[in-house]
A protein has these predicted regions:
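Sec-dependent bacterial lipoprotein signal peptides
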Residues: 1-21
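Aromatic- and Gly/Pro-enriched helix-to-coil junctions and flexible linker segments
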Residues: 21-123
Length: 123
């Protein structure tokens, strides 16, 4: 008789523990994305992304793979050929970039993509 009560209490405690420790809140599980891609500016939005993720290997001095992404005049060549988007989106036929590092986030890719759609201006 005593064993049954202990078992009942144990099951009740376990049920409370497992059901009370978790809750579904959409904002916690799926945080809103605050990726603003309106009116992209090369100087304000794109150059900083390239500087953080690309300049280590693709600057005027290093020029790895004969690719220089320092400055709009250099970047626009890779934009026009499709190489920039192909590389950062890891598309077939392109070297996935950045190599040996974390891929660009979806927001960073969206910003670059929208900047290109908006004319890839040197602004």
């Amino acid at each position: 008789m005593m064993e049954r009560q202990i078992t009942k209490y144990s099951l009740a405690v376990l049920a409370i523990v497992f059901t009370s420790c978790y809750y579904d809140v959409a904002e916690v599980l799926y945080p809103p994305t605050n990726c603003v891609t309106d009116n992209m500016s090369y100087a304000t939005d794109i150059a900083p992304i390239l500087q953080i993720n690309c300049y280590v290997c693709h600057n005027e001095a290093a020029n790895n793979g004969n690719v220089t992404l320092e400055g709009h005049a250099n970047v626009i060549n890779y934009v026009n050929s499709g190489q920039l988007m192909g590389a950062i989106k890891h598309q077939s036929g392109f070297s996935a970039m950045p190599q040996n590092s974390t891929p660009l986030g979806s927001c960073e890719i969206s910003k670059i993509e929208q900047w290109i759609v908006q004319g890839a201006q040197n602004n």
